[in-house]
Amino acid sequence: MKRVFEDNGSLKLIFIRHGKPDYNDCGDRDVSDGDLDATGIEQCKALGQRFKDIPVDAYFSSSLLRAFRTAAAICKEKPDQPAIEICPEIMECGTTRGYYGCSEEYLRRYYPNAKLCDTKMFGTEEYDFGCDTDEENKLRTRKFVEYLKDRFTYGQCVVVACQYATCEYLVAAALGLKEWDFHFAFTYTSATMVEIFPEGYSLLRCLNAMD
């Protein structure tokens, strides 16, 4: 990631897949909400070291534990212990309908400086969105990317920790694609960066980076 990270006036969106998960003991979480396994924890520690010196303006995570702990691994390496904003809207595709992930209080057990994102992107009082169909997944990831583009500006960098399938939708949304016939093979804790430029175009700067 350091090799391709340059101050070129773009808005940088870095999408990171979570570390290796374990679904054998989800405790009081839904069966779709796995934790990191021992390998995943070590992968995330290495991820934190990779991002230790990369300047980031904001951190987002889905409300699924494996993604949040991945984001936390980066933030724990930062001197200022930055906040992680939790967005249920970027949960994994196919997550059990009606389950919107872990609460803010629950996730603070793993990293204290956590808070729910300051807006519900569907404008409803309660979370109410689907993760099942292609159209549902396109809609919620597009809303999230538009939210980032409205909130942040050129020259800033945002990290988003999420899951395999959601990451593919997010990358496509950041690139401005409405339809696509390709699929990415995201490695655990890999980083994929899309740059958005003032001139109105987007660039896939790196894919599946592990360094």
Residue ranges and their predicted role:
Residues 1-57, 72-76, 154, 196-211:
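An N-terminal RHG(E/S)-centered segment typical of histidine phosphatases
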